[in-house]
C-alpha cells in the first residue's frame, strides 16, 4: 500500500484491515470469550482478536523474562484482554491530590516496634473483593473499604457499605460519579451527610443514578478523616496502628492491567501522578527480610479474577513506588 492510499484511508475514516489471526490461538481465543462473556460483531471480531493477540504476546514475553529473573511478578490474560493500552489510559484519569494545610495531616510518633507483617484481611477487617465494572468508581470502593475497617474495629461487625450511595450522592461535594471521583470528597460527603447506607439497602449498579439515600437506613458514619504524610514510614505506621488505609497509585501500565502475582515493580511508574484508588490492607516481605523483597498488600476493585484473587503486592521502600504514599487517608469513626 502506498503512503498516499494509507493517508487517504485515514482521512476518509476507513479502518485498516486487522492482521490475520494466529490459528494456533483459535481455541484459546474462544475459551477466553466464553469465560468473560464476550460477543462481537463481525467487524469488531477481527479488531478485538488482534488486540487480544498483541496483549497475549506481551504477557508471554513478560512471563518468559520473569522466569529468567528479570521481573518479580507474573502477568496473566484477564477480562481486559481486548483493550488497548490507550483505551485503558482514557479510563485511568489523573486524580487531583488535595493540598493539605500544615496541621491537617496526621503525624503520629513513628514506632520502632512495628510488626514485620500486617494483614487486616486475615483479622476480619476487610469485605470480599467486588467488581467496579463499567463504572469508574474505584474511589468509592476505596472509601467504603476504609470505613468498613474502622467500623469493624469499633463495633466488631463487618458490614459491606454502599458504593452506589457514594457514586450517586457525592456530586454536591465535587465528585463526578462513574466518570471521576476523589476519596477526599467522598469522605467529606459521608461526614456532612451524617451517614452511609449498606450494600444491602443501596446495592451497586455499575452506573450513575439519582441520590436515594435514606437516613433510616444509615449503617455507618464518620466523625472526620486524616491524611497520612506522603512517605512510606508514615504509611507503614498508619496501616499498622489504624487499619486499612485508602490509597491511590499510578496504574496506567499494561503490567498493572494484567498483573497476576508477585511483588509489582514497574520502572515507568510515577511517584507523583496517581490514577486509581485502592485499599491498603497490610505489608510484609518475602524470603528473608535482608533480601529486600518488601511489599504493600492492596485490595483492588476489578474482581477476583484480576491479580491474586483481587489483591496485589506493590514494592515497598522503593522510593514511594507508583505513588503508594502520595494520597493516603483514613476515616475517624
Swiss-Prot record:
Q: What is this protein called?
A: Cathepsin M
Keywords in alphabetical order, please.
Disulfide bond, Glycoprotein, Hydrolase, Lysosome, Protease, Signal, Thiol protease, Zymogen
Question: What's its top-level EC category?
Answer: hydrolase
The disulfide bonds in this chain are 135-178, 169-211, 269-322
> EC number(s) for this protein?
3.4.22.-
Please name the PANTHER family in this protein's record.
Answer: CYSTEINE PROTEASE FAMILY C1-RELATED
Q: What is the lineage of its organism?
A: Eukaryota, Metazoa, Chordata, Craniata, Vertebrata
Note the superkingdom of the native organism: Eukaryota
Amino acid at each position: 500500500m502506498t503512503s498516499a492510499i494509507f493517508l487517504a484511508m485515514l482521512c476518509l475514516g476507513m479502518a485498516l484491515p486487522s492482521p490475520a489471526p494466529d490459528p494456533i490461538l483459535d481455541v484459546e481465543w474462544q475459551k477466553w470469550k466464553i469465560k468473560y462473556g464476550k460477543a462481537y460483531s463481525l467487524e469488531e471480531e477481527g479488531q478485538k482478536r488482534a488486540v487480544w493477540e498483541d496483549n497475549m504476546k506481551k504477557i508471554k514475553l513478560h512471563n518468559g523474562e520473569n522466569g529468567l529473573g528479570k521481573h518479580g511478578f507474573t502477568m496473566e490474560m484477564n477480562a481486559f484482554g481486548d483493550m488497548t493500552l490507550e483505551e485503558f489510559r482514557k479510563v485511568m484519569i489523573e486524580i487531583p491530590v488535595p493540598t493539605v494545610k500544615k496541621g491537617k495531616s496526621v503525624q503520629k510518633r513513628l514506632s520502632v516496634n512495628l510488626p514485620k507483617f500486617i494483614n487486616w484481611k486475615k483479622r476480619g477487617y476487610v469485605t470480599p473483593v467486588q467488581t467496579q465494572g463499567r463504572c469508574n468508581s474505584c474511589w468509592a470502593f476505596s472509601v467504603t473499604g476504609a470505613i468498613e475497617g474502622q467500623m469493624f474495629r469499633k463495633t466488631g461487625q463487618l458490614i459491606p457499605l454502599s458504593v452506589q450511595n457514594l457514586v450517586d450522592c457525592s456530586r454536591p461535594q465535587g465528585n463526578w460519579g462513574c466518570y471521576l471521583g476523589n476519596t477526599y470528597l467522598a469522605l467529606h460527603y459521608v461526614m456532612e451527610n451524617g451517614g452511609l447506607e449498606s450494600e444491602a439497602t443501596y446495592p451497586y449498579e455499575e452506573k450513575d443514578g439519582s441520590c436515594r439515600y435514606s437516613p433510616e437506613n444509615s449503617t455507618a458514619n464518620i466523625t472526620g478523616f486524616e491524611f497520612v504524610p506522603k512517605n512510606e514510614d508514615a504509611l507503614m505506621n498508619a496501616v499498622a496502628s489504624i487499619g486499612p488505609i485508602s490509597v491511590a497509585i499510578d496504574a496506567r501500565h499494561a503490567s498493572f492491567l494484567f498483573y497476576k502475582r508477585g511483588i509489582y515493580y514497574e520502572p515507568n511508574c510515577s511517584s507523583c501522578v496517581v490514577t486509581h484508588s485502592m485499599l491498603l490492607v497490610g505489608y510484609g516481605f518475602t524470603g528473608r527480610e535482608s533480601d529486600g523483597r518488601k511489599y504493600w498488600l492492596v485490595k483492588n476493585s476489578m474482581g477476583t479474577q484480576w491479580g491474586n484473587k483481587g489483591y496485589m503486592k506493590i514494592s515497598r521502600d522503593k522510593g514511594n513506588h507508583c505513588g503508594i504514599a502520595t494520597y493516603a487517608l483514613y476515616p475517624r469513626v
